[in-house]
Swiss-Prot record:
GO terms for cellular component: cytosolic large ribosomal subunit. Forms part of the ribosomal stalk which helps the ribosome interact with GTP-bound translation factors. Is thus essential for accurate translation. GO terms for molecular function: mRNA binding; structural constituent of ribosome. SUPFAM superfamilies: ClpS-like, Ribosomal protein L7/12, oligomerisation (N-terminal) domain. It comes from Listeria monocytogenes serovar 1/2a (strain ATCC BAA-679 / EGD-e). Belongs to the bacterial ribosomal protein bL12 family. HAMAP family: Ribosomal_bL12. Keywords: Ribonucleoprotein, Ribosomal protein. Homodimer. Part of the ribosomal stalk of the 50S ribosomal subunit. Forms a multimeric L10(L12)X complex, where L10 forms an elongated spine to which 2 to 4 L12 dimers bind in a sequential fashion. Binds GTP-bound translation factors. This is Large ribosomal subunit protein bL12.
């Protein structure tokens, strides 16, 4: 039995989607393979991509809650009620997807008034 590649390709072109699906399943079963795309695995010890977007998270208000609320209002543009709720419900993200410089600046402002802040 000679294999004619052109005939096989012509048959595949004429097949319906359901028939092709059945063909793939049969090949998977017959040869013990899978048609799933291979997953790229990052090399261990390789240089990790540098993070470009950061999130500033208020961990806790510390002792001077009123000062922290004022700074949160300044940073986020929220109203008094919303800023107070955010501070009361810490830990909460204040700003997301920002540059490292801006994140460090916000962290410094909040820590200056006694808040505990994390940059992620």
């Amino acid at each position: 039995m000679a294999l004619n590649i052109e005939e096989i390709i012509a048959s595949v072109k004429e097949a319906s989607v359901l028939e092709l699906n059945d063909l793939v399943k049969a090949i998977e079963e017959e040869f013990g393979v899978t048609a799933a795309a291979p997953v790229a695995v990052a090399a261990a010890g390789g240089a990790a991509a540098e993070q470009t977007e950061f999130t500033v998270e208020l961990a806790s208000a510390g002792d001077s809650k009123i000062k922290v609320i004022k700074v949160v209002r300044e940073i986020t543009g929220l109203g008094l009620k919303e800023a107070k709720e955010l501070v009361d419900n810490a830990p909460k993200a204040l700003k997301e997807g920002i540059a490292k410089d801006e994140a460090e600046e916000i962290k410094a402002k909040l820590e200056e008034v006694g808040a505990n802040v994390e940059v992620k």
